[in-house]
Every structure is written in C-alpha cells, then in structure tokens.
Amino acid sequence: GFLSFIRGNFFIPDPKVFWVKPSVSYLQKYLDNHTIDVIISTGPPHSMHLIAEKLHQKNTVKWLADFRDPWSDLYYNKDFNQLAFAKNKNKRLEERILRNSDCILTVSNSLKEELEKTAKKVEVITNGFDDEFSASNNVILDTKFSISYIGLLPKQSNPKLLFKVLKGLCKESEIFKKDLKLNFIGDISEEVKVEILANKLDKNTDFVGYVSHQEAIAYQNKSQVLLLLIPNVKNNKGILTGKLFEYLKAK
C-alpha cells in the first residue's frame, strides 16, 4: 500500500533512521567521560549500525556490527515497492557498514557466506534462549491437542498447507475436530486469519495477541505441539530463527 511505499522509499534503511543524529550526540557525551573497549550494534533495525559507525569514526574503539537478519535482502523489503534510487541507497549503506566495521556477527553459516562477499571478517553466534525462565518440572500439558505459534507471524510464513490438512482431518474425525486447539500468541497477519477462516478452523482457534514473556513461556511449555515456520522466500535456508531455540527449551 501507500504507507509501505513511503516507508520503503523515504525511511532508509528504516523508520529508526531519525534516531541516528540524537543518539550519536547523546552517546558521544558518554564516551567523552567514560572508557569503553568495544561498540556493539545490532539490527534490524539497521539504523543502529549507522549510529555505531559514526561513533566508531569519532573514537578509537573497536566496532562489532551484529546482523540478526539480512539487510537489503530482508524478505519483506519487496513489500515496500522500492524505487531504484532507494534500493541503491539501501545497498550502499549496507556495503559501507560491512566494510567499515571491525567484525560482523551473524546467526547462521548461510548468512555468513552472503556477508563475506563484502565484509572482511564475519563470525557466527547463533541465537539462544534465556535460561532464567526454564520450564518447570511440573508443567501440565494441555488436555486438548494444542498447536501453538508464539511471536510475529507475517503473511510470508502463512502455513496454507497445514490449515488444509487440519481441515481434512476435522472432516474425517469429529473427535479430532473437538480436540483440536490452535493458539496464536502475538501479532498475526490478516492473510493468516483469512486462511484459517477459509478452512473453517476459526472455532478451533484462539488469537491471544500480545502477552508478557513469562506468559508466552507458559503457553509454550503446556502446548502439545509448537509450530515453527520460516518465510516462504528466496534464500530462506539462512534463516535460523531465535524461536527455534526458545522452543527447544520447552521440555
């Protein structure tokens, strides 16, 4: 839509670009009075790297740029309908960060291979989980056959085939239909909701919305099945989502 077009062509690399100037000013005052060993920037939002770059240039301090996701090749960028000038500007910013930082950190070997085409040094540190919220030994699983997805679910990850199969199973078995419970905890795209409705699974579905991290962990621990999805896009083999590690924690 129009707002996506504005976002993609005028807010480069992202809407947080307006943080850069005031953040550099604020952090430079801190650096003038404190000694630090290293600056670590993490994105997205990739505007954070622009802040770190300016501080790195002004101070003799090492800089690690952490790429949790790709930059110019991020899967939802195509939704912004970027014009050539915007694409080129975004790419130039990315290449500048990759060349100027002392080291690039990223989450998977596949993404490392892509970044190494430009960056001089790339290291992999995978996602993990916070052990502070470990599963309790006395977790009671749902009595229903619960399938839960926790987190942001964009249209690119819409599990159409899964919904089709579940619809078929509900048709075949009234027992299965009564026992099935789909939980979506977090922000779910409208396209996914439409697909659920089209497959007559709406009565089996609970859209919980946003909850605290602790509540999300509780849903995760009591669910019979945890649903892990990655975007159905080009180069998705490099996507090693942090959700995988959160799910692995649920015993």
Report the location of each language-model feature.
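Acidic anion/phosphate-binding donor-loop and adjacent secondary structure
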Residues: N77, G128-K144
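Acidic donor-binding loop of glycosyltransferase active sites
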Residues: D102, Q220-K237
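Nucleotide-activated donor-binding/catalytic signature segment of Leloir-type glycosyltransferases, i.e.
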Residues: D179-G186, E191-I217
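Conserved donor-binding/catalytic core segment of Leloir-type glycosyltransferases
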Residues: V139-S157, L161-K167
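Membrane-proximal helix-turn-helix segments that form the acceptor-binding/catalytic region
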Residues: S47-L50, K54-Q57, W71-S72, A84-I104
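Carbohydrate-associated surface elements
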Residues: V107-S110, I125-G128
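Conserved nucleotide-sugar donor-binding subdomain of glycosyltransferases
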Residues: G1-V38, A86-K91
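An aromatic- and histidine-rich active-site surface loop
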Residues: I12-V24, I39-N59, A65-D73
